[in-house]
């Protein structure tokens, strides 16, 4: 790299890596190798590997700046990036070299990798999708960066105590984060509260409280390329230090009160919003992210171009869900108040810059903020939102002069339930593109949630089906299957997943079938070891591993899975000597800390597991395990081991899902409803290679319209009746027999909102087909191979190419 001085680039030989790791341990960490612990060796290794990426990173950044390319800025409240060391080694192609270097130093790479804390910067699919997208942006050499919050405590650590979820703080920074660079000089003031002072036609936002946002950068390496990108995370810092006067008077709590209040903004991911103060903190958190980010984007732009007149040509800002939608009024505010744009001019630029991904159609999950709260915390932004709404409704009224209902339905301000700002509405009105994340979801989005907007802005809406990065989810997570693929179709599938289709030519070869089966068994043994170590439950790796791992939520219907587990238990109890296909039902996932019903479902799973796993009649025929503290790194162990992937959400509720893709990519067969991306997976793998059951989205709606009566299903279906009665009468919790009465009531007497009982029989019958097929291992593996071969479409590389072409209008950087 050109520099005004000479320097030696770090080299990649085993010998150089050994020197580098030892040097970092002694001179960066300041530790004697004789007494260094695993964490210190891990950090030394991370520093040594980071050094080998920095040059690429600086070169990429310099190329983006010198070529003056249009850049995308991807805003997300969550980034679940997973462990960084193993991914970096894979990207650089030095996995074996580092392993050998550490071996020669008497250290084990796998042990060090397991020491790394997962950065807990997300909750579920939203954050993992954002991380896959950053990986693909870098691998494709596209100019972009992610922006998020550097939470001190990530999604809580989940412990299971007496069957119940217990949350404890997840201090992922406990041993530092060598992967990041703190940018002491990149800091912005973020303001809250205050009032608006009118000066003629101009508004001034005055008397505000201020906190500082300080930048921390992480390198996002592209795979097998010099291209890298940046994830910039903001940490909150008090604008004034402690109150020394109060401290010296001995009032220590008061001395640090303001500082703590300021820094709470980046303390925890998604503070519990069941209280007013919790909701207010969440709003502050969202604004903290967007204010620092938009200021940074404008600062970077001006440094490069010395003008804001070409802003719309050079930047694209993408909103991952509604959490960062406040960046719309923030950009307007900065352009008008700080950079002297006229309102119309600022609005035109804003409309050209923003695009938005919708991730849910469920009304309870769509963000709205009370006008009163927004007015108190962000008065200037509320004023701008009112102005945007006024402008939009006036334009609409000219086109539809007598349609008051339409104006009411499309107004950004919802007047019907206590005056609330609808964030999704704001995003749709201003963004130049709005996308859904699967064909079904995008169709439902324009037919239901945004039907009025789709009629007003027909060219605004499009579909971009989600994808996953094959680097982390196949190459890294499943080395044994990757080896089989490399041997038969070559190695370049890592950057062109469509090449998996070449596996079709090998499907009828017994040796390949055997190799794929052997790889699966190796992965199942690895997971069985984890289960034995963590839960003290011994499972048979040759049993069918039936897996549902995702956030615990009623719409994802873990409850229906449990009903099938109990049905299976009852059948085995009735005839213990029959030839049952042995199964291990594996659950993992966190319930939001304030979500009573989801936590109740976790408790039920563990109660059921306790009874089944200790029943001598059952033995190895059925085991149930709930693996606590689900994370990216745990998923990388569970997914390759799955035989059956449970994707059983009520049709029309899951926008896309990405675990469905990860499982199929790793050779699991899917049992699922026609929901989210399952629909497109069915089209790609063929209906004979996937287990589909249950009502379609149209049938779900039709059932609602007719008046769904869950009690009828309960009364007509003997097995269902037995299962629900057992749960209600305390068979699985005799010490507290009434524990799940409310849960059973919600299904039978209170509407069964997610239609578990309506799909139960279809689901159980479909599970019988799964058993029948599993008794023919070659045929099962043939279908698994067809799934793998047809997963090429579901790469996040394809997804990002579609975003780049149809939404962001960005092109790769020349390196």
Which residues fall in each region the model found?
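A conserved ligand/cofactor-binding region detector
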Residues: 1-815
């Amino acid at each position: 790299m050109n520099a005004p001085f000479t320097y030696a680039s770090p080299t990649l030989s085993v010998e150089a890596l050994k020197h580098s790791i030892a040097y970092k341990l002694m001179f960066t960490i300041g530790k004697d190798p004789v007494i260094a612990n695993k964490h210190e060796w891990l950090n030394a290794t991370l520093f040594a590997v980071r050094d080998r990426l920095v040059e690429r990173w600086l070169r990429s950044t310099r190329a983006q700046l010198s070529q003056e390319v249009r850049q995308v800025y991807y805003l997300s409240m969550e980034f679940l990036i997973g462990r960084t060391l193993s991914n970096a080694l894979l990207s650089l192609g030095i996995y074996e070299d580092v392993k050998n270097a550490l071996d020669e130093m008497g250290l084990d790479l796998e042990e060090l990798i397991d020491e790394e804390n997962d950065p807990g910067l997300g909750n579920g699919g939203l954050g993992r999708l954002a991380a896959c997208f950053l990986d693909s942006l870098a691998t494709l050499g596209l100019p972009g960066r992610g922006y998020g919050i550097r939470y001190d405590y990530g999604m809580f650590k989940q412990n299971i105590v007496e069957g119940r979820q217990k949350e404890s703080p997840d201090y992922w920074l406990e041993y530092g984060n060598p992967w990041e660079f703190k940018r002491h000089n990149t800091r912005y003031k973020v303001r809250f509260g205050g009032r608006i002072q009118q000066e003629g036609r101009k508004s001034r936002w005055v008397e505000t409280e201020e906190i500082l946002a300080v930048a921390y950068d992480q390198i996002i390496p592209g795979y097998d390329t010099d291209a890298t990108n940046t994830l910039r995370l903001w940490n909150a810092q008090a604008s004034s230090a402690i109150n020394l006067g109060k401290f010296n008077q001995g009032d220590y709590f008061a001395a640090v009160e303001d500082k703590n209040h300021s820094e709470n903004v980046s303390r925890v991911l998604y503070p519990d919003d069941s209280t007013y103060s919790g909701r207010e903190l969440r709003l502050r958190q969202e604004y903290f992210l967007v204010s620092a980010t938009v200021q940074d984007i404008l600062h970077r732009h001006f440094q490069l171009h010395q003008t804001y007149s070409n802003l719309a040509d050079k930047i694209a800002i993408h909103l991952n869900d509604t959490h960062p939608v406040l960046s719309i009024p923030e950009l307007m505010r900065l352009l008008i108040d700080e950079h002297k744009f006229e309102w119309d001019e600022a609005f035109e630029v804003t409309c050209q810059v923003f695009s938005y991904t919708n991730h849910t159609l469920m009304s309870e999950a769509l963000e709205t903020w009370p006008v009163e709260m927004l007015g108190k915390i962000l008065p200037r932004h509320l004023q701008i939102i009112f102005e945007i709404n006024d402008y939009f409704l006036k334009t609409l009224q000219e086109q539809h002069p007598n349609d008051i209902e339409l104006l009411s339905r499309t107004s950004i301000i919802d007047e019907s339930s206590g005056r609330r700002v609808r964030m999704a509405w704001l995003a749709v009105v201003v963004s130049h593109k709005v996308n859904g994340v699967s064909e079904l979801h995008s169709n439902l989005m324009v037919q239901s949630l945004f039907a009025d907007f789709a009629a007003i802005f027909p060219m605004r809406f499009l579909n971009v089906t989600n994808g996953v990065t094959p680097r982390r989810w196949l190459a890294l997570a499943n080395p044994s299957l990757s080896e089989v693929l490399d041997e038969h179709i070559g190695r370049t599938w890592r950057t062109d997943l469509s090449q998996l289709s070449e596996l079709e030519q090998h499907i009828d070869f017994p040796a390949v079938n055997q190799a794929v089966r052997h790889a699966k068994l190796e992965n199942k043994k690895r997971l069985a070891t984890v289960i034995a170590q963590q839960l003290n439950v011994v499972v048979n790796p040759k049993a069918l591993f039936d897996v549902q791992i995702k956030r615990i939520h009623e719409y994802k219907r873990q409850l229906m899975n449990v009903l099938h587990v109990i049905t299976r238990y009852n059948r085995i109890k009735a005839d213990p000597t029959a030839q049952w296909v042995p199964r291990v039902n594996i659950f993992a996932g966190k319930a939001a800390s304030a979500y009573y019903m989801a936590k109740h479902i976790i408790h039920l799973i563990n109660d059921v597991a306790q009874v089944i796993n200790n029943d001598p009649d059952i033995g190895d025929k059925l085991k149930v395990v709930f693996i606590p503290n689900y994370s990216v790194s745990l998923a990388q162990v569970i997914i390759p081991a799955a035989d059956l992937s449970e994707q059983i959400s009520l049709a029309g509720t899951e926008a896309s899902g990405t675990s469905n893709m990860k499982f199929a990519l790793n050779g699991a067969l899917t049992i699922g409803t026609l929901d989210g991306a399952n629909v497109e997976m069915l089209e790609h793998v063929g209906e004979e290679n996937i287990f589909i059951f249950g009502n379609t989205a149209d049938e779900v709606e039709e059932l609602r319209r007719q008046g769904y009566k869950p009690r009828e299903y309960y009364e007509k279906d003997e097995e269902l009746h037995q299962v629900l009665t057992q749960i209600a009468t305390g068979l699985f919790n005799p010490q507290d027999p009434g524990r799940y009465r409310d849960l059973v009531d919600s299904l039978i007497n209170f509407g069964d909102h997610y239609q578990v009982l309506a799909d139960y029989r279809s689901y159980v019958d479909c599970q019988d087909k799964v058993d029948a097929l599993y008794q023919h291992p070659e045929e099962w593996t043939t279908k698994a191979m067809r799934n793998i071969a047809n997963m090429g479409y579901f790469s996040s590389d394809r997804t990002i190419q579609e975003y780049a072409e149809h939404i962001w209008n960005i092109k790769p950087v020349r390196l």
